[in-house]
């Protein structure tokens, strides 16, 4: 049994949230280093390259966290949607952090902290993309363990609506 098969399905969101936070933190730190001039030996073109790719990675990662975008759904949109605009947006939301990390990793120059954060950025973004692709490939139905009931979070909007319907139908409130 592989390591990925041992991950319980209900832990998926914790792993993706953690990797998205790591990607956002690394992108932001790298962007701050570029903006504050820590890479003094780099030329203007390299700094512009870093600025564009790291800014895109930080913006997309922040957007995905803020909007709670599910990468599995976005990958399904890429493969299944006929509309090019939908496919392009979905591809950008899923692929930009990983592509930006790889491009910056290939072009990184000498600075130790910058190189370290770029390496973590690459590992986290590729790991996130890998987890999402694995979930899409193997299906992502949530199965409750046999000894536990599947319980929705009480702050979930769908749970609240179902709770109000149950109250109005069965309890006549």
From Swiss-Prot:
Name recorded for this polypeptide: Uncharacterized protein C02F5.5
Family annotation (InterPro entries): DUF236 (IPR004296), DUF7087 (IPR055514)
Source species of the chain: Caenorhabditis elegans
């Amino acid at each position: 049994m592989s390591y990925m098969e041992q991950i319980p399905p209900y832990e998926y969101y914790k792993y993706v949230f953690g990797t998205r936070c790591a990607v956002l933190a690394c992108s932001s730190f790298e962007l701050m280093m570029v903006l504050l001039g820590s890479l003094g030996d780099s030329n203007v073109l390299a700094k512009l390259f870093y600025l564009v790719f790291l800014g895109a990675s930080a913006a997309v990662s922040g957007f995905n966290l803020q909007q709670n975008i599910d990468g599995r759904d976005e990958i399904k949109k890429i493969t299944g949607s006929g509309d090019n605009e939908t496919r392009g947006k979905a591809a950008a939301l899923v692929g930009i952090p990983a592509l930006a990390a790889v491009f910056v990793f290939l072009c990184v120059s000498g600075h130790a902290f910058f190189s370290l954060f770029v390496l973590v950025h690459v590992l986290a973004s590729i790991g996130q993309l890998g987890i999402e692709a694995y979930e899409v490939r193997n299906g992502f139905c949530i199965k409750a363990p046999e000894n536990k009931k599947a319980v929705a979070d009480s702050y979930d909007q769908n749970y609240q609506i179902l709770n109000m319907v149950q109250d109005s139908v069965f309890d006549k409130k």
